[in-house]
Amino acid sequence: MDELPYEIWIQIIDLLENPFNMLVSNKYTLSMTKYLKNINSFFMIFVEQGNLSWVKILHSQGYDIRFQNNEALKIACKYGYLEIVKYLYDHGCDIFIDNNFCLKIASERGHLEIVKYLYQNGYKFSNDSKPILDIAAANGHFEIIKYVRLLNPNNINKNGCIRMCWKIDNYDISIISYYYTDNKFKDNIYRATEYGNIEIIKKTWNKFCGNITVSNNLFKIAVVYGHLNIIKYMFKKGHRFPRQSNELIQIACGKGYLDIVKYLHKKGFSIVDSLLNIAGRFGHHDVVEYLYKRLKNVNLQKVITITIENDYLEIVKFFVTKENNPDEIRTYLILAHKHGHNRIIRYFDSLLIMTQQKLQSNLEN
């Protein structure tokens, strides 16, 4: 195998649709990766897939990971691949590239661990942090607002709570205001709920359980931060949030809290189409599957459009399979091209090829 000239092997490799299994067969073929015509495309695909092993392999063979203005780092931040972000940063990629794009896209997509990593490795809270807060707010990411706000060195109320007001439509959640509160009585129980400290809730329950406004606020906070144990405790103690309001189950769907969605549904909260749209908008596959099984006559085109626009490939695959309508593939492909979502573009391209091959086969038979 080693006796064939490079030129012959390169021609063979370029003819293969996926040459990588062969390339890793020995050191000789691995050394040819640098000569691949499509190495840039392959590298970006591996980053989009979260394949750290191949990112390391191609880098070890001389690939410039900062190619196209640190595009690989931007992609990793977008899709939440923390280990790839760490690797690229450790090997020279610039996390401040393009006016803090990495922090902005991670905040937009709700990747809290990447936001934390970026701040821990050079970002500082400043006036420049307001756009980050606004981006997180516009996309309903409570936990990022909380984290970034508490970085403010001028905040004298480090032990206070951040209260948020939000709005919800039939597929989106956004935060319209966020501010500190420092009422000692309320702040203690609000903060305890925010951080999931159920023991304080239990000890102080009799003090506030008769105050409907406070109880409702605590219930909302428990849902926002995913504290199912507090939600269960409040139900057990007789607290009842109005069933006609779907606000809380909408928040749970938007945050991806499947256990809370199930529990609220069990307690009488309705499952409606808008919940599916919200779960799809924020990329929560397990919640999407749970809701879909409990709905009838779902408007699949609507939710597929939402998930394409927001670049959640696995959910797109799930719904396209359920829809099973080849006539819509080109429409969806155009939408994916419009938003520049390469993973979804490749998926619909492959579906078109399969459809054309099936038609050709039927004609021949």
From Swiss-Prot:
Keyword annotations: ANK repeat, Repeat
InterPro entries: Ankyrin_rpt, Ankyrin_rpt-contain_sf
Gene3D superfamilies the UniProt entry points to: Ankyrin repeat-containing domain
Residue ranges of ANK repeats: 38-67, 68-97, 99-127, 129-158, 184-213, 214-243, 245-273, 275-298, 299-328, 330-361
Top-level lineage group: Viruses
Keyword Glycoprotein applies: no
Name used for this protein in its record: Putative ankyrin repeat protein R903
Species: Acanthamoeba polyphaga mimivirus (APMV)
